[in-house]
Amino acid sequence: MKFGKEYVAQMIPEWQQAYMDYTCLKTILREIKTSQKRSESQGVLKRKLSGRRNFSGLTKRYSRTFSSRDLENHDIMVHATTGDDGFEKYETTILKVSEVGRESELVFFKTLDLEFDKVNRFYRSNVEELVKEAVVLNRQMDALIAYRIKLDQPSTSWSCSETVSVDINALDSKEQKGKTLAEEMGIKVEENVSNGGDSTKETAPEALSVLDRIRLNKNQENPLSTIRNVLKLSNKEDIKFTKENLKKIEERLKNVFIEFYRKLRHLKNYSFLNTLAISKIMKKYDKIALRNAAKLYMEMVDKSYLTSSDEINKLMLRVESIFVEHFAGSNRSKGMNLLRPKVTKEKHRITFSTGFFVGCTVSLVIALGLFIHARNIMGAVGHKLYMETMFPLYSLFAFVVLHMIMYASNIYFWKRYRVNYPFIFGFKEGTELGYGHVLLLSFGLGTLALCAVLVNMDMEMDPNTNDYKTITELVPLFVVALVIAISVCPFNIFYRSSRFFFLMVLFRCIAAPLYKVNLPDFFLADQLTSQVQALRSLEFYICYYGWGDFKQRQSTCKSSDVYSTFYFIVAVIPYWSRFLQCVRRLIEEKDVSQGFNALKYLLTIVAVCLRTAFSINRGNDWKIAAWVFSGLATFYGTYWDIVYDWGLLHRPSKSWLREKLLVPHKSVYYVAMVVNVVLRLAWLQTVLDFNISFLHRETMVALIAILEIIRRGIWNFFRLENEHLNNVGKFRAFKSVPLPFNYDEEEDRDS
């Protein structure tokens, strides 16, 4: 792989703008090379050089007999100055500029200096932020040590004026024995501790006095904390010295250190990549321009803050030492395994298994079609009854499998265009599923469902199994029960971390607005709005099997008032959840756009209810009302999708898209907008009551649901692309991890 591609591949996606523009500099070098070739073709065999032509006017003849040392010392000169903001600025002067490509060389070094200043400034500002964060972490660790001491000595009464005998050295790092956590983190403190027993007595009350100034942060969002916030009650609580609290504090602080170490690694990689890019581009310049300027320029780079600063390396060593000692039981291998990033390895068995299940799914679909044709099931006497009972039961799997396939395609294109979806969704590092894993699960489920359909039909048509009609009817229920059992299985199989993450987010969607709304919450709720028909299928499962209709092989659900009522409610639940999420964000974030977004979902709720009422009653009044509100909801939703969720149709940008696009072909965005509008209009089909003669009504409803799932899959890609570009614009590459302790002076300062 060429360096240019490797350079881009190793970039932190959210920091792309902060990296040196290697491609731009290569383009300038090509211009220099082109100028030289053009000059050679015109018969220019010798180059005339001028020393400081733009500055002193002194000229000097260039001879190839110059020694390499002369060339090294006189090709360029780099000046370092300090700007008004206190950051270093570098300016390169070319001492010998040839007539051929002179302008391009000046542009090259001007661009290189600007890019290097940008990189150096970004690196230094981030290092300063991390040093400040290290001070905060040091205070958190001091509080943790004091908490441990107090928990180990519960009967000890203490105050700031008393001295107690506590072996605090036993809690410190072996390599840093006799030092406080502040010293370990590199913060200068007064040295009043020695290795003697008396000094321990003097240190213990000082360490324990920290507990006077701290409170526990109740950062874990729950309904109770939401109520406390509404009532303007503080979420800080007095410290209770229990082992359960200690475990929670240690777990939270461990996550803080892991994220802090991740920041350090990213910044170290940032420094290395940019330094390497400068070295590579200067070597190319020397080769093309026949100079020897790389060595001098790299000497300047080596002296700059970007490479000379060792704060990051020191912090990394201190974090490793503290983490291993206090969170890994002094087991360095275990500690470093937790700190270092988890790399997901592509496994051949995943590819093989996915291909196997794809083949099985295709084969079973063909077999199902041949079976239906050979047995003339569509023309059989019980065809209509079968479509009203079995079809809704099995269509559930089709909706879920299609949605998973669309999500797998989303992951593929997110990876291709470097959308950092694991960070956006907040997946635990190393546990995110790739598109291969999702395809494996989707086609595995598809194979299972198709096998169930064929078994059901075969048992229905086979005279030998005709007596087992009840068991035949229970086949789809067995499949649903199996899927639910796997989803909630506590054992570490079938991607447990991803399953539990999904279930947790699903619960937060159901419990809206009692939980703070994060992106995974409203993203999943939006997915559920495209699975209304699947939710109605689940309702049919409960009715068909719960009320015992499967024994008579005839559904009485639609004649039930309870079923009809819940037929409304089930369709509204996803939109109601999104509505409540928008209301909570409007109150918390004071973002007016969330109010307009809530209005969109409120309109959709009314439209869905009217459409459902029209599908049941078939009256003209219902039809007109459904027409009006469905049209408003469709127009409003389409506009919101394109303008707000996707960030397109931005007037100042070229072609009315947006300033930055990840997909290089603009036509993709125009096609996506048109397709979104068309598929949104398909939503109106239930109001239009447009039927195809050779399709059963249940089939038509399923086709409309499938089109909505496809629309949602397209929406997913551009929605996350827009979110990623927002993160890039704000250089947001790290998640915020809540701290366990809150100091009283910090609370006073915040207030």
UniProtKB/Swiss-Prot annotation:
Keyword terms: Cell membrane, Membrane, Phosphate transport, Transmembrane, Transmembrane helix, Transport
Keyword field contains Ribonucleoprotein: no
Source organism, top-level taxon: Eukaryota
Tissue: Expressed in root epidermis, leaf hydathodes, trichomes and petioles, stem vascular cylinder, receptacle, stigma apex and pollen grains.
Transmembrane segments annotated in the record for this chain: 352-372, 393-413, 435-455, 474-494, 624-644, 668-688
Coiled-coil regions listed: none
Membrane protein topology class: Multi-pass membrane protein
GO biological process: phosphate ion transport
InterPro entries to which the protein is assigned, alphabetical: EXS_C (IPR004342), PHO1_SPX (IPR034092), SPX_dom (IPR004331)
Record topological domains on the Cytoplasmic side: 1-351, 414-434, 495-623, 689-751
Residue span(s) of domain SPX: 1-299
Extracellular side: 373-392, 456-473, 645-667
Inducing or repressing factors: Not induced by Pi deficiency.
One cellular component (GO) term of this entry: plasma membrane
Summary of the function given for this chain in its UniProt record: May transport inorganic phosphate (Pi).
Family: Belongs to the SYG1 (TC 2.A.94) family.
Record's protein name: Phosphate transporter PHO1 homolog 8
Source organism per UniProt: Arabidopsis thaliana
Gene for this chain: PHO1-H8
